């Protein structure tokens, strides 16, 4: 059986903490990546985390987790502003070109370093 999908994993380092706290920017970037992949967005959910022990206005200064549920699978981002780090997944069923999403995230978040891994999922003999 051929692979059932392609899974892109991006680790972005050296990202501005302000960008990693901006849920609106992160959602629009996820949607732009979905569009670049030719994916159909079924649902979006983003959650802003508060900073432990902080009081307003810093209370929402923590990271963001966002997921786009796609007809083809999913896109997700998890951010750690205190470390300048974002972990991004793009999983597309079928023959994917998930690397098309990489440029979208790099342009929006301007990391100083990017680690990229691509895995073919499934593909068991049979």
What is each of the regions a protein language model found here?
Residues 1-126:
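Polybasic/polar functional segments that serve as interface/processing modules
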């Amino acid at each position: 059986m051929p692979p059932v999908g392609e899974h892109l994993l991006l680790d972005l380092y050296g990202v501005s903490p302000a960008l990693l706290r901006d849920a609106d920017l992160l959602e629009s970037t996820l949607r732009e990546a979905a569009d670049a992949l030719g994916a159909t967005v079924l649902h979006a959910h983003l959650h802003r985390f508060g900073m432990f022990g902080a009081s307003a206005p810093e209370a929402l200064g923590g990271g963001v987790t966002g997921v786009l549920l796609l007809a083809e699978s999913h896109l997700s981002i998890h951010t750690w502003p205190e470390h300048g780090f974002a972990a991004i997944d793009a999983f597309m069923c079928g023959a994917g070109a998930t690397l098309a999403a990489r440029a979208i995230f790099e342009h929006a978040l301007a990391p100083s370093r990017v680690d990229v891994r691509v895995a073919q999922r499934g593909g068991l003999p049979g």
